[in-house]
């Protein structure tokens, strides 16, 4: 009796292998289809005190045409800015390189070969066929990896955000250059004012020495008073040399900042408006904590774009776990003789498609993900540090703006009082009521007060420069590239 015994049908081993590969691919797809947040880390911010600031060209608020001309010259020729522009061009080329992966790779090739085959080997030539022959080939070769999962689109977006970051980096350099030019300019104006004060004082001391010499020769005063007068004259002459050195250094610094030639740096001549009255005048610049400080600061915006780019690179590293589909094709001619290379029967073509899933390189792919995550974390930490520094800069600059103005007011009052004291001591000395040492002491204190007044006026302007820079002034942040066209 026959029994109909049904045995289980086992799928072939190749089918099991295919299922395993598909399962791995599916698992990789699930793991890779995550999206990394591109927003910068959250930070606690202080309350804003003002809503609007117009500081795009803050240096014009000082009403110093010479300063405006120097800043314009620096923004056109400064070497740090030129280096920043070169970095932008490099980032732009990286975008083009990333975009190239989105298109097929097409090459043209020509080959010529000569070979000999055996008639007695494993695959012998049939009788009558030549053992030696030529082969000529000419054709187009194309390959294209289909961007199924958006790998190359993600790489392109990352490169675009790098480009935006480099553009904000240029604006960071721009704001720094403008501030450094202004600081050097006001330092130079103060040095000029000190020089004029010292030169005027030296002229008075020379007159005093001449007068005291005559009085000593007449026996009215002794050699002690004459020696004191000469010592005071020499002290002022030494101060003039020191002030001149400071002015020379500031002139050469401005020559470097404005991108002038080494010859001009060695023999600089910087146009300026040396006016003590203008230096002592306190300009009015709006101050406070703007509500859009983080938008105004190009260094913060630069790191925001770097965070976006780093997040996209994490996504790109995850997408490498997914299978890739590559299409290849060839179109051309092939013949054993050159004269028949372009005839009808010589035409050849081929087309192929391949699906590849990474298996044995998973460890390296995981390492790439870890590297990308660590790089994003580094940038995120840098972002938090930069935000901290931004608010510290504003806090310190606002405080300096108040304290330097108070110091200038005090020094101005002190100078006026010491001027009165000097005038009285001079009258008393000439009337014979006080020794010459009292006059010298009054002169010395007055000169010191006048010098401190000049430095206090300089510090007021330097504080305003620092405040404008801290508030993100010096660039057109509202119309900056990347503000409305983010590549996220």
Q: How should each PLM-predicted stretch be described?
A:
Residues 82-83, 99, 146-174, 224, ...:
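Sec/SRP-type N-terminal targeting helices
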Residues 29-32:
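C-terminal motif of bacterial Sec signal peptides marking the signal peptidase cleavage site
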Residues 4-21:
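Bacterial N-terminal signal peptides that target proteins for export
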Residues 53-62, 111-141, 264-286, 315, ...:
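Small/polar, glycine/serine/threonine/aspartate-rich low-complexity segments that form flexible
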Residues 52, 60, 69, 75, ...:
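Amphipathic alpha-helical coiled-coil scaffold segments and their short linker/junction regions
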Residues 262, 281-282, 431, 452-488:
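Acidic, low-complexity, intrinsically disordered peripheral segments
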Residues 34-96, 278-308, 358-359, 384-387, ...:
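Bacterial Sec-pathway N-terminal export signals of envelope proteins
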């Amino acid at each position: 009796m026959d029994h109909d015994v049904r045995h289980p049908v086992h799928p072939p081993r190749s089918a099991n292998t295919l299922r395993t590969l598909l399962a791995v691919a599916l698992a990789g797809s699930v793991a890779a289809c995550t999206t990394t947040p591109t927003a910068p880390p959250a930070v606690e911010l202080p309350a804003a005190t003002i809503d609007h600031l117009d500081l795009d060209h803050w240096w014009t608020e000082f009403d110093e045409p010479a300063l405006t001309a120097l800043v314009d010259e620096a923004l056109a020729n400064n070497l740090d800015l030129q280096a920043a522009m070169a970095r932008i061009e490099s980032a732009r080329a990286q975008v083009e390189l990333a975009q190239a992966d989105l298109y097929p790779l097409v090459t043209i090739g020509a080959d010529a070969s000569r070979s000999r085959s055996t008639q007695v080997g494993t695959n012998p030539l049939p009788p009558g066929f030549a053992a030696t022959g030529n082969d000529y080939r000419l054709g187009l070769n194309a390959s294209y990896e289909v961007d199924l999962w958006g790998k190359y689109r993600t790489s392109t977006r990352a490169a675009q955000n790098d480009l935006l970051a480099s553009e904000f980096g240029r604006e960071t350099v721009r704001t720094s250059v403008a501030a450094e030019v202004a600081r050097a300019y006001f330092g130079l104006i103060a040095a000029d004012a000190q020089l004029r004060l010292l030169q005027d004082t030296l002229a008075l001391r020379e007159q005093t020495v001449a007068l005291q010499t005559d009085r000593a020769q007449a026996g009215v005063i002794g050699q002690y008073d004459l020696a004191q007068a000469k010592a005071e004259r020499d002290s002022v002459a030494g101060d003039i040399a020191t002030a001149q050195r400071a002015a020379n250094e500031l002139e050469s610094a401005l020559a470097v900042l404005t991108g002038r030639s080494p010859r001009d740096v060695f023999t600089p001549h910087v146009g300026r408006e040396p006016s003590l009255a203008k230096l002592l005048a306190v300009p009015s610049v709006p101050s406070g904590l703007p509500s859009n400080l983080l938008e105004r600061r190009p260094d913060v915006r630069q790191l925001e774009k770097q965070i976006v780019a780093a997040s996209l690179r994490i996504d790109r590293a995850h997408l490498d776990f997914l299978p890739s589909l590559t299409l290849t094709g060839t179109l051309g001619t092939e013949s054993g003789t050159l004269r028949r290379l372009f005839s009808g029967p010589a035409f050849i073509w081929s087309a192929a498609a391949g699906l590849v899933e990474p298996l044995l390189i998973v460890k390296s792919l995981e390492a790439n993900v870890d590297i990308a995550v660590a790089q994003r974390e580094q940038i995120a930490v840098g972002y938090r540090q930069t935000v901290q520094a931004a608010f510290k800069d504003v806090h310190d600059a606002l405080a300096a703006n108040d304290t330097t103005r108070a110091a200038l007011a005090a020094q101005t009052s002190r100078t006026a009082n010491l001027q009165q004291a000097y005038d009285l001591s001079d009258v008393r000395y000439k009337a014979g009521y006080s020794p010459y040492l009292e006059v010298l002491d009054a002169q010395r204190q007055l000169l010191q007060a006048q010098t401190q007044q000049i430095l206090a006026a300089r510090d007021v302007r330097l504080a305003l420069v620092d405040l404008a820079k801290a508030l993100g002034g010096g660039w057109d942040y509202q119309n900056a590239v990347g503000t409305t066209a983010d590549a996220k």
